[in-house]
């Protein structure tokens, strides 16, 4: 066998996209200077977990990480897919961080993909699993992905800091994608959403729905927000609550906003076991519903911060696919 020629890259920017494109194009990459000047240099736990996930769904994939984690080599293999796979995503980032590149790779695998992901289903950093199911999967259908076999099942929920959620992702294989020209966002014609609560009173959900309807009912009549209260093992390991909203437009575009309220992770600046004051459920419903009806051109960091009185716990989803 000949010597492997690696394409050299620097830094940790857009790491998921780099790994996705390297895998699809079968291009070995070597990434250097990963946070080399930070107080905590090297790959983060969720980035290492993503590399291990790529190993799990691929055949003949090779990952080599140096001792400090500031450099790694990634030689992609053949994406095989497969059924009954299981991966623990950890609690550094939510499952949505892994779902976005995983669903693309699953489309081009040798076999249909069925994988169980464990970890955090809802947080304030990544798109929650409800948003992914309500917006990302229908978006893929616009590119010719069949609805048969494309499914995300939420079996239990988990929020920071300890997670405990589980989802089951199923992705069919395709031969090619259909090109799409899509420049008109259209006008909002209906709004769907879901609230959730884990290890807290279900009254939090009713309060969020009441606040959201206070905005939506003045604009359009077709609004349905469902509740999903979890208890027992399906409620994960930490208390929390949140909401996911999807506004569908006349052109088939999906405008989404979601958030989850829970106690902070230790790496988010909180102390393990420290009881912080949580954002009131009424404010959650009001702010997220306001973000959901923003024009898509205003979904930028500056606009989100200006309209976000918390400065941290709400996001309008652009995510992996962007705009």
Task: Report residues per predicted region.
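Structural preference for solvent-exposed beta-strand-turn elements
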Residues: 1-323
């Amino acid at each position: 066998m000949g010597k492997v020629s690696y394409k050299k890259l620097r830094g940790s920017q857009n790491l998921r996209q780099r790994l996705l494109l390297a895998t699809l194009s079968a291009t070995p990459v070597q990434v250097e200077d990963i946070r080399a000047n930070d107080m905590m240099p090297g790959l983060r736990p969720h980035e290492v977990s993503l590399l291990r996930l790529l190993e799990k769904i691929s055949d003949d994939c090779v990952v080599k990480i140096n001792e400090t984690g500031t450099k790694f080599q990634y030689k992609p293999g053949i994406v095989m897919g497969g059924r009954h796979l299981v991966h623990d995503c950890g609690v550094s980032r939510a499952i949505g961080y892994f779902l976005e590149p995983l669903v693309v790779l699953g489309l081009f695998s040798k076999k249909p993909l069925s994988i169980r992901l464990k970890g955090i289903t809802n947080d304030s950093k990544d798109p929650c699993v409800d948003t992914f199911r309500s917006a990302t999967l229908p978006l893929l259908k616009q590119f010719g992905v069949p609805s048969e076999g494309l499914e995300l099942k939420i079996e239990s929920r988990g929020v920071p800091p300890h997670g405990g959620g589980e989802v089951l992702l199923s992705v069919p294989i395709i031969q090619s994608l259909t090109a799409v020209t899509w420049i008109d966002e259209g006008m909002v014609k209906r709004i769907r959403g879901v609230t959730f609560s884990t290890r807290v009173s279900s009254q939090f959900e009713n309060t969020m729905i009441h606040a959201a309807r206070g905005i939506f009912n003045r604009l359009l009549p077709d609004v349905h927000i469902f509740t999903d209260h979890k208890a027992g093992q399906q409620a994960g390991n930490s208390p929390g609550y949140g909401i996911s909203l999807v506004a569908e437009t006349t052109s088939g575009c999906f405008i989404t906003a979601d958030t989850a309220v829970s106690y902070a992770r230790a790496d988010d600046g909180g102390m393990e076991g420290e009881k912080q004051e949580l954002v009131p459920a009424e404010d959650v419903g009001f702010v997220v519903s306001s973000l959901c009806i923003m024009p898509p051109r205003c979904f930028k960091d500056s606009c989100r911060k200006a309209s976000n009185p918390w400065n941290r716990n709400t996001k309008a989803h652009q995510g992996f696919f962007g705009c």
